[in-house]
Amino acid sequence: MKNINPTHTQAWKSLEAHKAELSNTTIQDLFKQEKNRFDDYSLTFNNQILVDFSKNNINQTTLSHLRQLAQECALDSAKEAMFTGEKINRTENRAVLHTALRNRTNTPVLVDGKDVMPEVNAVLAKMKDFCQRIISGEWKGYTGKAITDVVNIGIGGSDLGPYMVTEALRPYKNHLNMHFVSNVDGTHIAETLKKVNPETTLFLVASKTFTTQETMTNAQSARDWLLKAAKDESAVAKHFAALSTNAKDVEKFGIDTNNMFEFWDWVGGRYSLWSAIGLSIALSIGFENFEALLNGAHEMDKHFRTTPIEKNIPTTLALVGLWNTNFLGAQTEAILPYDQYLHRFAAYFQQGNMESNGKYVDRDGNVINNYQTGPIIWGEPGTNGQHAFYQLIHQGTTLIPCDFIAPAQSHNPLADHHNKLLSNFFAQTEALAFGKTKEEVEAEFVKAGKSLDDVKNIVPFKVFTGNKPTNSILVQKITPFTLGALIAMYEHKIFVQGVIFNIFSFDQWGVELGKQLANRILPELTDSEKVASHDSSTNGLINQFKAWR
């Protein structure tokens, strides 16, 4: 993968000049200028996902320069490097092969000359057998009862992805009740354990190293809780499975290593739901539906890898996003799913994007000071957000590009709920793009029988400037297949931006310093002695904590 500073390319210089040319052109102007704008600025995937990016402040010249930027930054060779197992995560000397986990064609993928697909398929087969035993009731707990509840204990990618997907695919769930514990705050595990029965609960401990502090603290508490009821160490093997590679510590914990599901160092945590980390998903929706999730992602992988840039959905979203942040000044992007089942989708890609592209050092080791890397990602389901933060999106002083996501078909077609939901979905992007002028506000008042003299002081507050960029992503229906494709679409968008930003998207050194300091502080919290080993603020906080506890 080549190291290319994007600001040194001819395309970047062209985009800077083009920005000035477009500075007085609004989205409304662009719709007037281009009569076929929707057709020319929308793409479809598999006749199941429609991506409309027409309500952005871009024209064909913008897209041409952005595509040239991708070419000058060697995107095509970077894609091939990822898909073929080159060690593009250079700071950790690792390949990046979450795509191999869903490689449904079984085309060989080599890492250090070895095809990884036989191992991938072996773990999938093991997961399938395990799911069949749990779901059918063949697997029994320590009193001979079948499993009714599954508790996934993990953090970060070992929690966010499985939780998001199991929630998104609740219409496909079976009789098993799913629970997720991540926070080291004892409240999280304590409240979860109140809901389950030790005789019928299975715990999945998701930690590659089996040493992750938060995960192992929660796992130990779950083990203690189980043994308090079972009073027999042999019960652990009947109620715990591990998603890990540390067989020694897994066995020491009391878990049968036959119920240890491996994954590899070329699987990053935030891209791991496709691996054994997705066991909770497969248990929740059944293995066939888990395979459909993999199939959807694989189809998007093929689209991303082979489709020309002009029709390439993840690449287009990445380029438009880069334009909004680096040339129009946006520092944040909102992901707004109009589907309650997708209520954790924004949180999932908050990690996916910000942990991947929240970097200030480029691939050459230089500090980046003349362009912006990853944006802040956030969001909530519609229409809840409309009654919370949309005010700022519409009339605030901060530019916030938004992705609106909605299914055409609801899993719960109650009365006219879905039409009301989708009417808001369509209305919001229209309002953000076109706004409402002073003249339109005045005309509304006149129509309502008001005199302009009486309302002149209120008119400015009812004006909407519009010109707020949005993407509309309409999905035929949220199924395992389409969800897999949607997730992979965003993954590849993040990858494309990382390539152009000239950063390493697959490490996360930014999480390390806090962990190191916490390990140093933890022994200081065991007694009541005052500390003086830190700065005055940290000393004061620790000492007050000790006084109050």
From Swiss-Prot:
Its main location: cytoplasm. Pathway: Carbohydrate biosynthesis; gluconeogenesis; Carbohydrate degradation; glycolysis; D-glyceraldehyde 3-phosphate and glycerone phosphate from D-glucose: step 2/4. InterPro entries: G6P_Isomerase, G6P_Isomerase_C, Phosphoglucose_isomerase_CS, SIS_dom_sf, SIS_PGI_1, SIS_PGI_2. GO terms for cellular component: cytosol. It catalyses: alpha-D-glucose 6-phosphate = beta-D-fructose 6-phosphate. The active site is at 355 (proton donor), 387, 515. The keyword Membrane does not apply. Keywords: Cytoplasm, Gluconeogenesis, Glycolysis, Isomerase. The keyword Cytoplasm applies. Its EC number is 5.3.1.9. One of its GO terms (biological process) is glucose 6-phosphate metabolic process. It is found in: Cytoplasm. GO terms for molecular function: carbohydrate derivative binding; glucose-6-phosphate isomerase activity; monosaccharide binding. It comes from the Bacteria. Catalyzes the reversible isomerization of glucose-6-phosphate to fructose-6-phosphate. Belongs to the GPI family. This is Glucose-6-phosphate isomerase. It comes from Haemophilus influenzae (strain 86-028NP). The gene is pgi.
